[in-house]
Each structure stands twice: as C-alpha cells, then as structure tokens.
Amino acid sequence: AAYRAGFDRLQTDAPVSRQIAEISMAAAHQCHRKWRELEWHLIGCYREGMDEFEMAEGLSYAMFPGSIPNFVDACGVWLNLIRDGRVEPGPAFRLWAETEGQGGFDEVS
C-alpha cells in the first residue's frame, strides 16, 4: 500500500500519462526481476484502461536492457494474472491465457 501511495504522489501533475508511467515501471521491474512490483504495475495498466497490445509493446522494449529470459518470465507473470482472474483481459489476451502448452520446455519432455 505504501508503494502505491508513493507512486500516486509522484504522478501528481506528472508530465506523462498514468498509463505510460505504469508500463514504464512495469518494464523497469521486469529488468530487475521484481515480479511482485511488476504485477502491481500490470494491474495498474488495466486499472488505467491501457490497451493490452501497447502493454505488450512496452514490456518488449525491456528485452534489450533486461534480457529475453526476463521478458519471457514477465509474460508468465502477466499470464498468471489473467488466469487467476486478477485482471480482465480483452478477447485476444483471453485467448492467449486459455491456450495450453506455454510453459517452455515442460511440454517437450
């Protein structure tokens, strides 16, 4: 709660939109493998009504400084938020969440 309250205070009169601030922080936490904080900001993106394709694009930019494996893990965090019913996805991302066999190499063995 204190983290979100601090983030809210920082956003007062900020020169960037709340959506951009949320996805930027999500991408930064992805680079540092801070999965709980990533969840908070993905949920914040949904709360702000951000387009899911723009969210995916925002996270994809973090592949360069934060690595592809971190991006893949971040997508897993997002996928679990959808599957656990913690966010309400649009049709395309609901279909993504309902698609089986996305666990990496587990399905091969």
Name each model-derived stretch.
Residues 61, 66-69:
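Substrate/cofactor-recognition hotspot
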Residues 1-20, 46-47, 71-109:
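Acidic, glycine/proline-rich low-complexity segments that act as flexible tails and inter-domain linkers
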Residues 1-4, 31-39, 66:
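Short acidic alpha-helix initiation/capping motifs at coil-to-helix transition points
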Residues 14, 31-35, 49, 69:
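Residues at alpha-helix boundaries and short interhelical turns
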Residues 27, 58-62, 74-77:
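Short acidic/histidine-centered micro-motifs embedded in hydrophobic/aromatic stretches
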Residues 40-59:
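A cross-kingdom feature marking solvent-exposed beta-strand/loop segments within repeated
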Residues 20-35:
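Amphipathic, charged-and-aliphatic alpha-helical interface segments
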